[in-house]
């Protein structure tokens, strides 16, 4: 059985400022760097053999910190990028017009082929995330990879593994530097294919995540 760990990047400056990131980027805060070190301490005990990350800066930095703890190299895979939020990227969430908020809601509420202008649909996101995950099946026997990605992207992946629509990711709370795990199994009695073992574990973090403080 292949075990794959899924980690959301550490807190960023734009997370703190409530700006829409998408495939734009901002650096980790000092708290985000600390979160990544704490993931590294947990990952050191898990026997991680490969660290594969979105090629955006915030995930790369998170992956580099984890890799230092695990003694692994980092492999970049653009398929693990966040949802492309088009013309709304870099915008403060509270600055959106009614029309712009409508675009965002169409996307996250599951309107068929809903997308922000110049952005990506949830279906497109789901397809590339599943392709990236499937690549883990090609790793040598005994591998235990850890993927570093983004909140909406990972939520979409976990939701669709569970048989839910991609937009159900809004019902999952995957905080910064949370750890999830999915397993690939073949069984005559249980579900074959990908199954979700854990989602959104933050027991390794020693301080509340920002979205806990903003509730």
Swiss-Prot record:
Endpoints of the signal sequence: none
Entry keywords, A to Z: Glycolysis, Isomerase
EC number: 5.4.2.-
Keyword Isomerase: yes
GO MF assignments: phosphatase activity; phosphoglycerate mutase activity
Pfam families the record matches: His_Phos_1 (PF00300)
Entry GO terms, CC: cytoplasm
Pathway note: Carbohydrate degradation; glycolysis; pyruvate from D-glyceraldehyde 3-phosphate: step 3/5
GO biological process, one term: glycolytic process
Positions annotated to bind substrate: 8-15, 21-22, 58, 60, 82-85, 104-105, 151-152
Active-site annotation: 9, 82
Catalyzed reactions per annotation: (2R)-2-phosphoglycerate = (2R)-3-phosphoglycerate
Family per similarity comment: Belongs to the phosphoglycerate mutase family. GpmB subfamily.
Family annotation (PANTHER family): BROAD-SPECIFICITY PHOSPHATASE YOR283W-RELATED, HISTIDINE PHOSPHATASE FAMILY PROTEIN-RELATED
Name of the molecule in the record: Probable phosphoglycerate mutase GpmB
Species, as recorded: Klebsiella pneumoniae (strain 342)
